[in-house]
Amino acid sequence: MSLSRLSKFFAGPSPHLSREDALKIFKRDRFKCYYCGLDGRHNYENWLILTVDHVHPHAKGGQRSMNNLVTACQPCNLIKGKRIYKSLQEAKEYVLTKREEWRHVFQEQVKAV
């Protein structure tokens, strides 16, 4: 991996926020994923996958304000994607439903080996 790509990988939890702002979000949310509850304080691996999620996606005009940002683990952030939801609760329900669907796929694939 080139040095420039490597530096982007370790650039921080969001390309749109400073590390300081991301840390404010993490502290406010107690280092827990809003969607699944993964605790980033539990171990290094959990902490490593924490990101900052734009509730109303940045790509769709969402602001970088504190009330539009939540702590999310990478899997939940990817599942939520750039969709727009009626509420944060609707987004959470969508993410948790998809995670459960994927859990069943995982279990079937592992069982088949």
Walk through the language-model features, giving the residues of each.
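A boundary/linker detector
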Residues: M1-E20, L38-G40, K92-V113
